[in-house]
Amino acid sequence: MKEPDLKKIRKAMEKELDPKRYEHTLGVAYTAASLAMCYGADLNSALIAGMLHDCAKCLSNEKKISICKKHDLPINPAEEKNPFLLHAKVGSYLASKKYGVTDPDILNAILNHTTGRPDMSLLEKIVWLSDYIEPGRKQAPNLPEIRRIAFEDLDKALIMALENTLSYLKGGNMEIDSMTQKTYDLSLIHISEPTRLRRIS
């Protein structure tokens, strides 16, 4: 089935998101597109996933919880304590039901863009990292270096960003989703393997 028109999605996001979130969304979408070209991923899928990754971000926590309960979307302990984390899960649901996305890889990229998951697909890695390095981000440690490495060795950049994320959460005594920790731990194992994702030469 044909995926939804990107122009329509962009107009919908401009309407649904606040200005700051919309600018971030554009940054993620275009960064994802750049990484997709670098690593040979599908360009349109990267743009759609990037454009929709935060489509539920501006919903209230109450609304996100309501959607999860109404449509039997599971809520884990970390999400119960921090309902804002539900925006990825709800966003993936809305991408399918409201915006007409049918590609499972796009839906998974939206679903896992906050926590990551072990054995992410190329598109999932691209969207996760694009959310971290897009031009509007300013304060993450070693950000210029991670941005540079992202276009040379995707897995290495992913590890660096995951390390920073876990360090930030631990330093602030904040809840760490078990999936993020698993993603980091397994990525450390896989990074030494010959399947590391490097730019197309």
Model-identified regions with their sequence ranges:
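Acidic/histidine-enriched, glycine/proline-rich intrinsically disordered or flexible terminal extensions
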Residues: S178-L188
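Divalent metal-dependent catalytic cores for phosphoryl transfer on phosphate-bearing substrates
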Residues: R10-E16, C38-M160
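Long, amphipathic alpha-helical surface segments
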Residues: K156-G172
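Conserved small/polar residues in nucleotide/adenosyl-binding loops
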Residues: I189-T195
